[in-house]
Amino acid sequence: MIDREQVKKVAFLARLEISEQEQEMFTRQLGAILDYIAELQQVDTEGVPPTTRAIEVHNVVRPDALVVFEDREGILENAPERAEDFFKVPRIMED
């Protein structure tokens, strides 16, 4: 179980100012979270492969293909500033 002093220490380390009321609230909430974690640690996971998510996710990518865009000038007309056939953007890196 977590106590108020531990909550105050965590708040101090995180550079957070919390009121007495918040200290009490966080003590209860963090205590409940830690109790739940302790409960989860009792679950038998023998034979269960390690995983990072409940549902297996696979990236779906499309093959790269060159596509010629017919209305280049139409897009460039909307550019706030342009240099020849390119959008001109503010410099973000120094020389």
UniProtKB/Swiss-Prot annotation:
Enzyme Commission no: 6.3.5.-
Domain of life according to the entry: Bacteria
Catalyzed reactions: L-glutamyl-tRNA(Gln) + L-glutamine + ATP + H2O = L-glutaminyl-tRNA(Gln) + L-glutamate + ADP + phosphate + H(+); L-aspartyl-tRNA(Asn) + L-glutamine + ATP + H2O = L-asparaginyl-tRNA(Asn) + L-glutamate + ADP + phosphate + 2 H(+)
UniProt GO MF annotations: asparaginyl-tRNA synthase (glutamine-hydrolyzing) activity; ATP binding; glutaminyl-tRNA synthase (glutamine-hydrolyzing) activity
GO biological process entries: glutaminyl-tRNAGln biosynthesis via transamidation; regulation of translational fidelity; translation
Swiss-Prot/TrEMBL keywords: ATP-binding, Ligase, Nucleotide-binding, Protein biosynthesis
Family classification: Belongs to the GatC family.
Record note on quaternary structure: Heterotrimer of A, B and C subunits.
Chain's role: Allows the formation of correctly charged Asn-tRNA(Asn) or Gln-tRNA(Gln) through the transamidation of misacylated Asp-tRNA(Asn) or Glu-tRNA(Gln) in organisms which lack either or both of asparaginyl-tRNA or glutaminyl-tRNA synthetases. The reaction takes place in the presence of glutamine and ATP through an activated phospho-Asp-tRNA(Asn) or phospho-Glu-tRNA(Gln).
Protein name in UniProt: Aspartyl/glutamyl-tRNA(Asn/Gln) amidotransferase subunit C
Source organism: Gloeobacter violaceus (strain ATCC 29082 / PCC 7421)
Gene field: gatC
